[in-house]
Amino acid sequence: MNYNSLFDHTLLRADASVEEIKQLCDEAVKFNFFSVCVNPSYVPYVKEQLHNSSVKICTVVGFPLGQTSTKQKVYETKIAIKEGADEIDMVLNISEFKENCACVVNEIRKYKKVCKKKILKVIVETALLSENEIEKATLVVIDGGADFIKTSTGFSSRGASIKDIEIMKNVIEKNNSKLKIKASGGIKTLTFVEELIKAGAERIGSSKSVEIIKETLNKN
């Protein structure tokens, strides 16, 4: 299996340097990762670095808490796309989701309308949700018309778990949805990646992508 094309090679640290972002881009090209995932301020720079490659540019919106207004997230999304982003990883407003699911569905629809043919991933921060809430969040993301549901920001108490993915996949299958799953947060080994994919993940977000791919080379 070609694991390389499943990875969003990620660097979202607040203190990430230009040199580190350049290295991220170079690694993504070398290992043919699907995308690099960076904070919005680096999107123009990354666009320059990747202009002769097939590597996509992914950035985050409302990150990492999701506690900005819908208008702010829409504006962030418009700017990110204008500056070169191919994919938007938007953090769901968790407190709003817990209070009013219908309202959040409408928000996601607004973000997808702005994204048009660009990919929209909705981060639901599973560390803050019960299993029942993960099911509800998956339904919300399906109804909102997003392309992916994403487990985690990587900035909460935990990242992705196999159980998270299994719950999401079960809801997706029951509803005959085309929604895809991105697993992220704390993914550091090939074994864990294999388990996540088996459970239903179709994209992996990790800052350890290179180390994981080197594991596959050693395994072969």
Curated annotation (Swiss-Prot):
Alphabetical UniProt keywords: Cytoplasm, Lyase, Schiff base
Catalytic activity: 2-deoxy-D-ribose 5-phosphate = D-glyceraldehyde 3-phosphate + acetaldehyde
Alphabetized GO MF terms: deoxyribose-phosphate aldolase activity
Broad class of enzyme this protein falls into: lyase
Active site residues of this protein: D89 (proton donor/acceptor), K150 (schiff-base intermediate with acetaldehyde), K182 (proton donor/acceptor)
Protein family according to the UniProt entry: Belongs to the DeoC/FbaB aldolase family. DeoC type 1 subfamily.
Record-given protein name: Deoxyribose-phosphate aldolase
Top-level taxonomy: Bacteria, Bacillati, Mycoplasmatota, Mycoplasmoidales, Mycoplasmoidaceae
